[in-house]
Amino acid sequence: MEVNILAFIATTLFVLVPTAFLLIIYVKTVSQSD
């Protein structure tokens, strides 16, 4: 099976970007709650 590097990168970014965004919001919310 050939590994499509571009598809792999696109999928990784598609997962990591929203995850990082939500993580930042979570951290800010916890910091403000304290």
From Swiss-Prot:
Its membrane topology: Single-pass membrane protein
Pfam families: PsbM
Stored InterPro entries: PSII_PsbM, PSII_PsbM_sf
Predominant location category: plastid
Domain of life, source organism: Eukaryota
Keywords per UniProt: Chloroplast, Membrane, Photosynthesis, Photosystem II, Plastid, Reaction center, Thylakoid, Transmembrane, Transmembrane helix
Signal sequence residues: none
Gene Ontology cellular component annotations, sorted alphabetically: chloroplast thylakoid membrane; photosystem II
Subcellular location per the Swiss-Prot or TrEMBL entry: Plastid, Chloroplast thylakoid membrane
TM ranges: 5-25
Swiss-Prot/TrEMBL GO biological process terms: photosynthesis, light reaction
NCBIfam families given in the database record: PS_II_psbM
Subunit structure: PSII is composed of 1 copy each of membrane proteins PsbA, PsbB, PsbC, PsbD, PsbE, PsbF, PsbH, PsbI, PsbJ, PsbK, PsbL, PsbM, PsbT, PsbX, PsbY, PsbZ, Psb30/Ycf12, at least 3 peripheral proteins of the oxygen-evolving complex and a large number of cofactors. It forms dimeric complexes.
Protein family membership: Belongs to the PsbM family.
Purpose of the protein: One of the components of the core complex of photosystem II (PSII). PSII is a light-driven water:plastoquinone oxidoreductase that uses light energy to abstract electrons from H(2)O, generating O(2) and a proton gradient subsequently used for ATP formation. It consists of a core antenna complex that captures photons, and an electron transfer chain that converts photonic excitation into a charge separation. This subunit is found at the monomer-monomer interface.
Protein known as: Photosystem II reaction center protein M
